[in-house]
């Protein structure tokens, strides 16, 4: 069995200013997305320029942070939000929802489309290959924070989280790092390397992420304040991923 290494959540400090690994992972994700987008524009000679790319990353960053935090409080910790609304601003403590962030990015992309006259699916197809490595960075942030641990297990690589209990658990953050991050990146990046019908890359991302999340969540301990939210075995993350999967299937079929 393995033991969680109990990593200091603070990466470094400048006097009273403390930089947390969790926030640093988000910064790495946004910078990585810009670099990947820049490479795709140059390599594939896409009808994008650097100003558009920078604006898109900026809009998306706002959507991810605002939508992710609001989504977490609404989907996962609504009672805490009602009684202590100021916790909404404590992002460094963790607590971000991918699905809330996705809704935030959808709004940001709509505003971007209005500004630059691009279609929504064109923007979606451009963004999709840039996202998974950012998701990977976010899951590393979850692991460093020692949050979102897995269910009890007896597999040889089970990890004991001393701040939780003495039971070996699935390191589910690392599963999600591998599935939603690395595997999904390889899938989307390779698929998007050739010209595709508009909307196909977006559809593949929606389906791919939903499937990866549905699998990974089956090893993750449900949030203590929620437990299982449907049929006695579905978590909130799985419930929110099902519409993604259905929309992805519909879009894939519509763009066949």
Swiss-Prot record:
MF terms in GO: phosphatidylglycerol-prolipoprotein diacylglyceryl transferase activity
Subcellular location field: Cell inner membrane
GO biological process, one term: lipoprotein biosynthetic process
Keywords, in A-Z order: Cell inner membrane, Cell membrane, Membrane, Transferase, Transmembrane, Transmembrane helix
Membrane topology, from the record: Multi-pass membrane protein
Residue spans crossing the bilayer: 19-39, 56-76, 91-111, 231-251
Gene Ontology cellular-component annotations: plasma membrane
InterPro entries linked: Lgt (IPR001640)
Functional pathway: Protein modification; lipoprotein biosynthesis (diacylglyceryl transfer)
UniProt-listed Pfam families: LGT (PF01790)
E.C. number(s) listed in UniProt: 2.5.1.145
Binding positions for a 1,2-diacyl-sn-glycero-3-phospho-(1'-sn-glycerol) per the UniProt entry: 139
Function: Catalyzes the transfer of the diacylglyceryl group from phosphatidylglycerol to the sulfhydryl group of the N-terminal cysteine of a prolipoprotein, the first step in the formation of mature lipoproteins.
Annotated family: Belongs to the Lgt family.
HAMAP family from the UniProt entry: Lgt
NCBIfam families hit by this protein: lgt
Name of protein: Phosphatidylglycerol--prolipoprotein diacylglyceryl transferase
Source species: Legionella pneumophila (strain Corby)
């Amino acid at each position: 069995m393995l033991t969680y290494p109990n990593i200091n959540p603070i990466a470094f400090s400048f006097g009273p200013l403390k930089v947390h690994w969790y926030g640093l992972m988000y910064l790495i994700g946004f910078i990585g997305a810009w670099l990947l987008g820049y490479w795709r524009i140059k390599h594939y000679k896409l009808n994008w320029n650097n100003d558009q790319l920078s604006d898109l990353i900026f809009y998306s960053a706002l959507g991810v942070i605002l939508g992710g935090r609001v989504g977490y409080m609404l989907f996962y910790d609504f009672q805490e939000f009602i009684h202590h609304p100021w916790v909404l601003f404590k992002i460094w403590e963790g607590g971000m929802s991918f699905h809330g962030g996705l809704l935030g990015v959808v709004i940001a992309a709509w505003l971007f489309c209005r500004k630059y006259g691009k279609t929504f699916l064109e923007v979606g197809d451009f963004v999709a290959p840039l996202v998974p490595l950012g998701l990977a960075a976010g899951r590393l942030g979850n692991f460093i924070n020692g949050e979102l641990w897995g269910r009890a297990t007896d597999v040889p690589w089970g990890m004991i989280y001393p701040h939780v209990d003495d039971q070996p658990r699935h390191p589910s953050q690392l599963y999600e790092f591998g599935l939603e991050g690395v595997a999904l990146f390889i899938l989307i990046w390779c698929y998007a390397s050739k010209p595709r019908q508009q909307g196909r890359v977006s559809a593949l991302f929606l389906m791919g992420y939903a499937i990866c999340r549905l699998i990974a969540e089956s090893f993750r301990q449900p949030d203590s304040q929620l437990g299982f939210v449907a049929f006695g075995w579905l978590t909130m993350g799985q419930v929110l991923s099902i519409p993604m999967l259905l929309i992805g299937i519909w879009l894939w079929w519509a763009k066949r």
